Amino acid sequence: MQQTFFKDPILGEIIFDENTKWMYELVNTKAFQRLRNIKQLGINFHFYPSGVHTRYAHSLGVYELIRRILNSSAFLNIDQIKKQTVLVAGLLHDLGHGPHSHAFEIYFAKNPDFKKQLFIHEKVTSMLVNSEPIVSILKANKIDPNLIGALIDENQNIQPINWWMRQLISSDLDTDRMDYLLRDAYFTGTSHSLVDYQSIINGMECVDNQGTYEIVFQEKCLPFIENFLITRHHMYQSIYSDGRSIATELNLWFVFQRIKALIEEDNFNFHNFKNVESVIKPLLKNQLFKKSLLTCFVKLDDYVFHSFLVNTFETTKDAILKTLLDSYLNTLKFQVKFYESCEKRDLDFELKVKEYQTPSYFITKFNNQFKGFYEGWNKHKNELKIKTSQNKIKNLSEISMLVKRSNELFFENSFYRWANVFYQN
């Protein structure tokens, strides 16, 4: 097989070379091809019309960033199988996303803060990795599918995962975040995401720390790392936690709360959407997603899901469900109001809830949890490490006053934005 490459507006070229050409088999599986029809930003494209890029392109981008990192001189001493394991984990890390990406996990949670999720995309990804044909492709190339699953789903605690492997897949400065910040900013037209990923890669070192390898960053990388963290913070403020996106996601949460009630009354018809029914009906009955549903799941994407919602809107005779779907499919009628405190929010909620005949479908409290500016501070051993000019390894929060002060400011002002989400005609 000749070298295969994709042209990419973010990274220039994505290459499957002599060492990774077998991974192109994974790209051609149905589970991976499905990602062509899963939008990276979920339902945010409603408000960012050009933000229709896909999990497919993002997954290829993560793979390419890892490939470039592992081809650098810093990783010459790393075992080839370990390198390929991390590459595969990066390539496959998003296989388990449902339609609308992260929002799908909210729709079937018991409450809108989704503290208890019935569908967790990392676990579904691990199931797909351990299913045919992917599992056979991995084993034929001496890659342990369980290790891939453990790299993607952090709750699977198996050995031997070196810390450097986890750092590239899931950390405060991982390849997933590098790619999605660049890609999301480009396709939404957001100008404040100027991540200098090449300078960050150039400043990486893989060092032996008491028998296990870990990634450290040269001190000259500090401005680029700080900029990366600032960029992510701003992207959450301006795009990922946009109030309109929250309102739209909660609109659909209400839709599925109503569908759930109609199913319990034996008064809902999925019509010909049997794969949708097979996947979401157990979730609406508060059952965890099971591996036996994977065959149906890989047939679900944004387009199938949208067709199901449109068909339901056109055929339902239930006035509440029709009103909720009209808001989602046509003109969004749900709004988000943020408050300075939980007490003020609750007081306003008690007044506003009286305006609705069936309030459980039209108004809810919502605690919007902020993403920390830098999360390494609360898991001290997992902090980003900086190699100083004196060759000492220190935690990022010791070196960067920006990181230290930003976290202090962040936690002084609380983890949450208290909100009410409600229908306003």
UniProtKB/Swiss-Prot annotation:
Describe the location of the HD domain by residue ranges: 55-181
UniProt note: phenotype after gene disruption: Probably essential, it was not disrupted in a global transposon mutagenesis study.
Could you give a GO molecular-function term held by this entry? dGTPase activity
Q: Which InterPro entries match?
A: dGTPase-like, HD/PDEase_dom, HD_domain
CDD domains (alphabetical): HDc
GO biological process per UniProt: dGTP catabolic process
Q: What is this protein called?
A: Uncharacterized protein MG461
Q: Which organism is it from?
A: Mycoplasma genitalium (strain ATCC 33530 / DSM 19775 / NCTC 10195 / G37)
